[in-house]
């Protein structure tokens, strides 16, 4: 496998650390979009405070991400080791199949526990301002957990398509996916709603180093009329961002979050779906 020569030249000039190509360009290059960046893992550089950054080279983009040398991040399982000044070489397996299965299952269960925690915040007895937000966060977390439990590494821009192609062997998994999709409201994806959500998202993420890259991906999905995928992706980005914020910070930006996530205020429907998500989380954690 080759990546553009200018990339290799840039890496030769800029970095002496061990590097690897990760992300969809390494894991699933056949599904990568033109807007997808080349994710470069840098091992052992500023381990206590890795400085991620974006570099534009021509029409393509590199994103550098710092990892500890002994990282067990699932992102690295199908990495392609960089040999400076040469082609890319597929790295020898660093993990046994048993270790990989165990890691995926553990990561999946962890995300489902997170989903259960979020949906459990919703009261069944009274309407609360942040109930629709908790529900969407739970739905995204549960879907991510399902992919991980199925040994599929979630790739946010491709995630809805990953779910479409997932070989579901258990009815409880299929039911959980359908419930989550209903919670997210993907069928509401119209250009009007997406344009409004996109503007709110850019305001929410304006301080992030990668906001231009994320925006270019959304524009790609819009331009290619992948409206459902775009709706899912915007929501995923917002929920990922909110997971790193405390509750007071979330409430300070509640209006923007509501617009970006296309939240509705149907209390009865939120209560019904919260009960179903809670049931699905518990069922999957038992299996």
Where are these regions (language model features)?
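Generic alpha-helical propensity signal that fires on short helical segments
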Residues: 37-39, 80-82, 156, 165
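Glycine-centered flexibility motif
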Residues: 23-24, 85, 145
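Active-site nucleotide-donor binding segment shared across nucleotidyl transfer reactions
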Residues: 5-47
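General "foldedness" signal
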Residues: 33-35, 52-54, 76-78, 152, ...
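Generic preference for hydrophobic/aromatic residues in regular secondary structure cores
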Residues: 38, 42, 62-64, 177-181
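Conserved catalytic core of two-metal-ion nucleotidyltransferases
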Residues: 44-121, 125, 129-132
């Amino acid at each position: 496998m080759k990546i553009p020569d200018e990339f290799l030249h840039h890496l030769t000039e800029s970095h002496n650390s061990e590097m690897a190509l990760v992300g969809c360009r390494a894991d699933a290059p056949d599904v990568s979009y033109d807007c997808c960046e080349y994710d470069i893992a840098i091992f052992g550089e500023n381990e206590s405070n890795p400085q991620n950054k974006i570099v534009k080279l021509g029409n393509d983009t590199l994103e550098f991400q710092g990892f500890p040398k002994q990282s067990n991040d699932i992102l690295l399982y199908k990495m392609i080791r960089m040999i400076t000044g040469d082609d890319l070489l597929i790295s020898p397996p660093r993990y046994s199949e048993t270790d990989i299965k165990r890691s995926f299952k553990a990561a999946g269960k962890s995300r489902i526990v997170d989903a259960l925690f979020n949906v459990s915040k919703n009261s069944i007895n009274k309407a609360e301002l942040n109930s629709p937000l908790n529900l969407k966060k739970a739905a995204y977390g549960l879907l991510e957990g399902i992919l991980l439990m199925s040994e599929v590494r979630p790739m946010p821009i491709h995630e809805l398509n990953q779910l479409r192609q997932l070989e579901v062997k258990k009815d409880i998994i299929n039911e959980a996916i359908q419930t989550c999709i209903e919670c997210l409201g993907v069928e509401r994806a119209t250009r009007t709603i997406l344009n409004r959500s996109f503007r709110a998202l850019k305001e929410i993420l304006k301080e992030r180093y990668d906001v231009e890259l994320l925006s270019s991906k959304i524009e790609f999905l819009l331009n290619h009329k992948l409206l459902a995928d775009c709706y899912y992706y915007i929501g995923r980005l917002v929920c990922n961002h909110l997971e790193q914020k405390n509750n007071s910070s979330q409430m300070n930006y509640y209006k923007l979050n509501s617009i970006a996530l296309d939240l509705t205020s149907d209390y009865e429907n939120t209560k019904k779906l919260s009960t179903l998500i809670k049931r699905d989380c518990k069922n999957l954690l038992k299996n």
